[in-house]
Amino acid sequence: MNGVVAALEEMPPVTRFYTGACVLLTTAVHLEFVTPFHLYFNWELIIRKYQFWRLITSFCFFGSFGFSFLFNMIFTYRYCMMLEEGSFRGRRADFVYMFLFGAVLMILSGIFVQILFLGQAFTIMLVYIWSRRNPMIQMNFFGVLTFTAPYLPWVLLLFSLLLGNNAVVDFMGIACGHIYFFLEDVFPFQEHGKRFLKTPQWLVYLFDERRPEPLPEDERPGGFEWGDEQPEQEQHD
């Protein structure tokens, strides 16, 4: 038990919260506290019946316990953590903003595309963003394929097709990941480019560690006054 607690404490906070929510929700379904019919994404029920929790639960349920759940959770945990501890290290508010931006894109897409659960697409989005920010890393897929990181989302798409899954889910994740990557990592650095995804200050206030303001120079301890006067040397007889 202590080992589990220690492992949880070592997880970065956003990764711990999201993966923990996924496991808890799946456990609740397994124990029949709730059913998937109360969790899936349905825009009509959200708007007309005010079932706003579906905006969250549709991202946190990956199906019942089994190979598919384990596979998705490993990828979700791994790439969420690598992003949080990698390119988003020390920028927790930016990471949360990326979560929110991606979720909004998927919710808008889900209105027009009949997808019941958005968690797998969200995982593919995380994988896509990580892969584009780490283009030189060599990947090995089950010891069969070797390729560089940017090909990973497409390999997962092919694997999903081989398993008979709906490819629209993976395409949605790739598309949302590319939109974020383009707006954050490409367009701002082009001629006449602009950064549109600036993190709101209220998120910075809530999630980023607030560092104390440095003291004025004349109030800082230590140091030596490098002026014309030198410290008098002690006279010895």
Swiss-Prot record:
Residues 1-20, 76-97, 188-237 are cytoplasmic. It holds the Pfam family DER1. One of its GO terms (biological process) is endoplasmic reticulum unfolded protein response. It is a multi-pass membrane protein. GO terms for cellular component: endoplasmic reticulum membrane. One of its GO terms (molecular function) is signal recognition particle binding. Induction: By endoplasmic reticulum stress. Residues 226-237 have a biased composition (Acidic residues). Its main location: endoplasmic reticulum. Residues 212-222 have a biased composition (Basic and acidic residues). The keyword Endoplasmic reticulum applies. It comes from the Eukaryota. Belongs to the derlin family. May be required for the degradation process of some specific misfolded endoplasmic reticulum (ER) luminal proteins. Participates in the transfer of misfolded proteins from the ER to the cytosol, where they are destroyed by the proteasome in a ubiquitin-dependent manner. Its precise function remains unclear, but its ability to complement der1 mutations in C.cerevisiae, suggests a similar function in the degradation of ER misfolded proteins. This is Derlin-2. It comes from Caenorhabditis elegans. The gene is der-2.
